[in-house]
Amino acid sequence: MSAPLTWHDVIGNEKEQPYFLDTLAYVAKERQAGKTIYPPQQDVFNAFRYTELADIKVVILGQDPYHGPNQAHGLSFSVQPGIPAPPSLVNMYKELASDIPDFQHPNHGCLISWAKQGVLLLNTVLTVERGNAHSHANLGWETFTDKVIAAINEHRSGVVFLLWGSHAQKKGYFIDANKHHVLKAPHPSPLSAHRGFFGCQHFSKANTLLEKQGIAPINWTPELPQ
């Protein structure tokens, strides 16, 4: 048996590409200029730290990190422990409460326990300037995260992709639906959740799809890290 492929194996080369180096250099320069950039530098790649390629069961695509103080920590939709759940995550909890019978509504918004179970919480853009949504769009992060999704598509099978809103759906358009499971719904933000995110039952559907493959389901009740 060969060892399972790692992130390093499939996207390690990206770190040497000019677009990637340019992106990192731009972000570093902004930080050096005194701008507040989220998430903190050590958290930018947390999605890959918590969820190795071989362990992915579910992918939840976000857009760019939260741009308020102490929120973003490198996982889409998740906030640092002790920070109230933002509106989109509140709506995710509402859907979970109606979808998963034993869901326990948490008093926090930290989704590290999902990531550790194999839910890749991936934003398509990995940094943002404080108070300025989408300020780091089109720097090069999208190229990198396209490569990440392509690597999952190619090297894994049976992964459940949850694509909420047009941004995530465009990003995931090339995922092979014969090889993976692609579930689509409107975004959970208060602007669009009532258009079909509520009632989509993606969390229970994801678990059913995993169990059909003999894979342990996700415990969707977020637990704080010990």
Curated annotation (Swiss-Prot):
GO terms, molecular function: uracil DNA N-glycosylase activity
Record field: catalytic activity: Hydrolyzes single-stranded DNA or mismatched double-stranded DNA and polynucleotides, releasing free uracil
Gene Ontology, cellular component aspect: cytoplasm
UniProt-listed InterPro entries: UDG_fam1, Ura-DNA_Glyclase_AS, Uracil-DNA_glycosylase-like, Uracil-DNA_glycosylase-like_sf
Annotated EC: 3.2.2.27
Main localization category: cytoplasm
Keyword Cytoplasm: yes
Pfam families attached to this UniProt entry: UDG
Localization per record: Cytoplasm
Keywords, comma-separated and alphabetical: Cytoplasm, DNA damage, DNA repair, Hydrolase
Broad class of enzyme this protein falls into: hydrolase
GO terms under biological process: base-excision repair, AP site formation via deaminated base removal
Protein function: Excises uracil residues from the DNA which can arise as a result of misincorporation of dUMP residues by DNA polymerase or due to deamination of cytosine.
HAMAP family: UDG
Family: Belongs to the uracil-DNA glycosylase (UDG) superfamily. UNG family.
Official protein name in the record: Uracil-DNA glycosylase
Native source species: Photorhabdus laumondii subsp. laumondii (strain DSM 15139 / CIP 105565 / TT01) (Photorhabdus luminescens subsp. laumondii)
Gene: ung
